[in-house]
């Protein structure tokens, strides 16, 4: 066997970058000559300013292309009424968030930075530190949330109080530019990243497509669809596969070629992307509460692989599609242009439109009366809640379990009021609350039967589908799970939440137990006291309302 000649293949050969940028400043950059080459000198302040501005913009604004996809739902005759309702709420939320006070989502995410530094770019070193300072500045100065926990030992944690550390991955490349992708990645969508170790046997058209559709179905609605879904097939390692998933979901690899070659270049399979998008529309899950728009788009990327391995990765970017490019070149610091005026996509006739029929529910009365009212309505019923709600999420539930385990009574407020799974962002001056949308319900599933057996958590409010144990617990104890739209945290803070106060564990920050007063807070009955589960009915094709 003759040896093949050496040929270097760039693993991700990209086409032209068509991103539209704006010039932040021409300060902090200069050029110099060294060893016959022109060098771009970048001051440390440039990296700090770039990171600070990029994460500020991404926290309050989204890409124009994404907003146009949301707006298109309103004009699609095949979209369900629930699809259109959710899309309208997203646009209203974006219009509020774009003012720069209330962030798009209360989970303002882990700050992730991917940087590609040209060999003729000099910064003097310490890039991770100066970029981290920019992240710090944004999270400290804006009304964002601190979501990062530092481990003091294997089991004890403390909130870092700054949202640091950031995840920063820097690469050396050719050229005289420094290019970045900045991602504010919330926990809900990050948790929908999966790796499947498969074999060559999967690589037939029928098997692969069916496999991907079934995996796509398992995403559920907990990470706030409509999604930007990414599949990656192959990879020289598992970690390469998942890195590619992350970047593909951010549309970073959109300019890849659309066919492979014998040297192993990555490519997009645009035909399979379209086929999978059509399958996603048939799932019935829609934009959270049934319909067509489970996904805005799908990316499928094929990578080379070791003959003994076939990793398959899946991930999403959620409705808070907070991805933004930036770069530094001779002209200065450039930031990707996001949509400053998302309100332009709201049709005038929907400006003052009501929300359609919703059952009014007064929460300021005995729990038995509230439960009796809810019991009159089927799953999928839209509700409008007014009154007192308790707010608590992961650590709060662990604390409540500790009380029961210690033989103590649950606090009366857990018995008297619904509990909303959420953690607020910082409260801006003059506002009753910071952005406060729901977190993923499924993480609290294991607590439901225990709490309800002790008279607490009888009405739960959160986002996404839940496990059978929650349906069983609600059937057994007469409880309900109500769904809140995942994503429009700013509009909830501005329009529905009238008061916020901490009632327990203030040292836990966003994980504390809070009390809110709400007015016309939107929700849907998803699990009732009779053993019905809205999402299971969709799967079983039994929900008559989900595709109207």
From Swiss-Prot:
Obligatory cofactor(s): [4Fe-4S] cluster
Catalysed reactions, as listed in the record: (S)-malate = fumarate + H2O; (S,S)-tartrate = oxaloacetate + H2O
Enzyme class: lyase
EC number: 4.2.1.2, 4.2.1.81
MF term (GO), any: D(-)-tartrate dehydratase activity
Pfam families xrefs: Fumerase, Fumerase_C
Induction, per UniProt: Is mainly expressed during anaerobic growth. Is under the control of the Fnr transcriptional regulator.
Sequence positions that bind [4Fe-4S] cluster: 105, 224, 318
Co-factor binding details: Binds 1 [4Fe-4S] cluster.
Keyword list, A-Z: 4Fe-4S, Acetylation, Iron, Iron-sulfur, Lyase, Metal-binding
PANTHER family reported in the protein's UniProt record: FUMARATE HYDRATASE CLASS I, ANAEROBIC, FUMARATE HYDRATASE-RELATED
Assembly, per entry: Homodimer.
Protein name: Fumarate hydratase class I, anaerobic
Originating species: Escherichia coli (strain K12)
Lineage: Bacteria, Pseudomonadati, Pseudomonadota, Gammaproteobacteria, Enterobacterales
């Amino acid at each position: 066997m003759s040896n093949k000649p050496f040929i270097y293949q760039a693993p991700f050969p990209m086409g032209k970058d068509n991103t539209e940028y704006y010039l932040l400043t021409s300060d902090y950059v200069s050029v110099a000559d060294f060893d016959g080459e022109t060098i771009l000198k970048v001051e440390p302040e440039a990296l700090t300013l770039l990171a600070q501005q990029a994460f500020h913009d991404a926290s309050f604004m989204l890409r124009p292309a994404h907003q146009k996809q949301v707006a298109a739902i309103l004009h699609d005759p095949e979209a369900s009424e629930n699809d259109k309702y959710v899309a309208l709420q997203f646009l209203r939320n974006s219009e509020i968030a774009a003012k720069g006070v209330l962030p798009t989502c209360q989970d303002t995410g882990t700050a992730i930075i991917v940087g590609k530094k040209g060999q003729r770019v000099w910064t003097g070193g310490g890039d991770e530190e100066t970029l981290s300072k920019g992240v710090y500045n944004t999270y400290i100065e804006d009304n964002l949330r601190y979501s990062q926990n530092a481990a003091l030992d294997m089991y004890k944690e403390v909130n870092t109080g700054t949202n640091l550390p950031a995840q920063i991955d820097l690469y050396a490349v050719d050229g005289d530019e420094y290019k970045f992708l900045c991602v504010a990645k919330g926990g809900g969508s990050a948790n929908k990243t999966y790796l499947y170790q498969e074999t060559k046997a999967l690589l037939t058209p029928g098997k692969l497509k069916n496999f991907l559709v079934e995996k796509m179905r398992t995403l559920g609605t907990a990470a706030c669809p409509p999604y930007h879904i990414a599949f990656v097939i192959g990879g020289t390692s598992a970690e390469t596969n998942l890195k590619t998933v992350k970047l593909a979901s951010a549309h970073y690899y959109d300019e890849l070629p659309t066919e492979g070659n014998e040297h192993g270049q990555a490519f997009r399979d645009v035909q399979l992307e379209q086929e999978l998008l059509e399958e996603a529309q048939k799932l019935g899950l829609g934009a959270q509460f049934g319909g067509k728009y489970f996904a805005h788009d799908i990316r499928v990327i094929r990578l080379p692989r070791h003959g003994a391995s076939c990793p398959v990765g899946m991930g999403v970017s959620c409705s808070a599609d907070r991805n933004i490019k930036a770069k530094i070149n001779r002209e200065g610091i450039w930031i990707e242009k996001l949509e400053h005026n998302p309100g332009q996509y709201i049709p005038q006739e929907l400006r003052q439109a009501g929300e359609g029929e919703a059952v009014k529910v007064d929460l300021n009365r005995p729990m038995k009366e509230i439960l009796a009212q809810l019991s009159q309505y089927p799953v999928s019923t839209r509700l409008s809640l007014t009154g007192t709600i308790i707010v608590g999420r992961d650590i709060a539930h662990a604390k409540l379990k500790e009380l029961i385990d210690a033989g103590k009574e649950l606090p009366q407020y857990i018995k008297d009021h619904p509990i909303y799974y959420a953690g607020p962002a910082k409260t801006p001056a003059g506002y009753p609350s910071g952005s406060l949308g729901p977190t993923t319900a499924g993480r609290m599933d294991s607590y439901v039967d225990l709490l309800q057996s002790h008279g607490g958590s009888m009405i739960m409010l959160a986002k996404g589908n839940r496990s059978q144990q929650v349906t069983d617990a609600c059937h057994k104890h007469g409880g309900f799970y109500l769904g809140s739209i995942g994503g429009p945290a700013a509009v909830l803070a501005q329009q529905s939440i009238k008061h916020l106060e901490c009632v327990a564990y203030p040292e836990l920050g966003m994980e504390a137990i809070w009390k809110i007063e709400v007015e016309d807070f939107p929700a849907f009955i998803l699990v009732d006291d009779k053993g019905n589960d809205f999402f299971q009915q969709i799967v079983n094709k039994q929900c008559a309302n989900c595709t109207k």
